[in-house]
A protein has these predicted regions:
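Long C-terminal interaction/binding lobes of large macromolecular proteins
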Residues: 1-3, 9-11, 17, 23-169
Length: 169
């Protein structure tokens, strides 16, 4: 359980644009969450990822920064890892024979590690959430929470700007 949250979804019925975010009922400060993935049970751990959160898999040097269309979501660790796998699959699909075998091998190794974390004792990965608004969390007894450094606060993207609507729209 991750406390009371409000889900805010703004959408345009004309064009289909949509933005979703999760805001905790209690005030939060900027923070980071880290979880070392060592067993299959951790894949079931609940997460809340807000639209301002940067998600990383440290050992693989993979990072997803919030962009202008970033949305928040509630999922589990496995769901977060699946999002990384889908991106790797897209990149692999875009590579052609002219690309180096080294790139393809590296991507396939990343995919193997993500798909086998918790199943293969030799695969351990660190999942990290950095959220300058403090709305994200990893809910697992082994997850650690920390304050963000000043350098992190200055360098982290904060996600999409809130939608602004005028009375004339």
């Amino acid at each position: 359980y991750f406390g009371e949250h409000t889900q805010v979804t703004v959408m345009c019925h004309s064009c289909g644009w949509r933005q979703t975010d999760f805001i905790p009922a209690e005030g939060k400060k900027a923070g980071g969450w880290t979880l070392i993935l060592e067993n299959e049970e951790q894949l079931k751990s609940r997460i809340v990822r807000s639209s301002s959160c940067t998600v990383s898999i440290l050992e693989l040097d993979l990072e997803v920064n919030p962009g202008s269309s970033s949305t928040g979501y509630v999922s589990n660790v496995e769901g977060v890892l699946n999002r990384f796998t889908k991106i790797i699959d897209m990149v692999l699909g875009d590579l052609d024979d002219e690309n180096s075998n080294e790139d393809m091998t590296r991507l396939k190794d990343m995919k193997y590690q993500i798909e086998n974390v918790g199943k293969d004792d030799d695969v351990r990965l660190t999942l990290e959430f950095l959220d300058p608004h403090g709305h994200s969390m990893i809910i697992d007894q082994n997850a650690t929470e920390r304050d963000l450094t000043e350098a992190e606060l200055e360098s982290l993207p904060v996600g999409p700007d809130p939608a602004v609507f005028s009375k004339n729209d």
